[in-house]
Amino acid sequence: MTTTTGLRGRWAQGLQPRYFTWVIMDRLGAGERPGGFARNHRKVRRQEELIWLSVHGFTHIVSLLDSPHNLHAYEEAGLASVHVPLGPHDELVPRLEVVYATIGKLLDDPMEKLFVHHEEFGDRLLGVMGGYLLYAGLVDQGTHAISIIEKLTGRSVGSVGREIVAATLDEHLHR
């Protein structure tokens, strides 16, 4: 478990992950990979963001990264994690079903509070979050899912994210 012993004030609270957004209030949050992505990744920032997730009661981190990066850090911080690689674009549809089912199964427990991340807070993650709203039956139209995600994040969902939402509908992925 990450210890905040000796830390005072805002440092004991950690640092909110970059672009953190509630998709389902107090149950499902999303953001950039803790510590940042690729060359911008910083170990100290990752530790601060993991402290924030722990202090705020997150029970699982769902990593959509293709690689197992950060999983050891989550374990060291005492945060349970699930690695569900989103994979390359041409393998997306079969993987979406696994991603959605994993998130859904975790959220079936009312005590679960999830943080989902991809490498960066971009179209792929936004599309998956919009697709999950469809999968879970929280919305029934792709345009509604996209609109909600855009409103929550303050970002436009681009072509890749829209393709993910469309694939969720086209493949009839739902609970």
Q: What is the predicted role of each segment?
A:
Residues G122-V128:
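Glycine-rich nucleophile elbow surrounding the catalytic serine of serine-hydrolase chemistry
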Residues M1-F115, V128-R175:
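Cys-dependent protein tyrosine phosphatase-like superfamily
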Residues H118:
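Conserved S/T- and glycine-rich ATP-binding loop of Class I adenylate-forming
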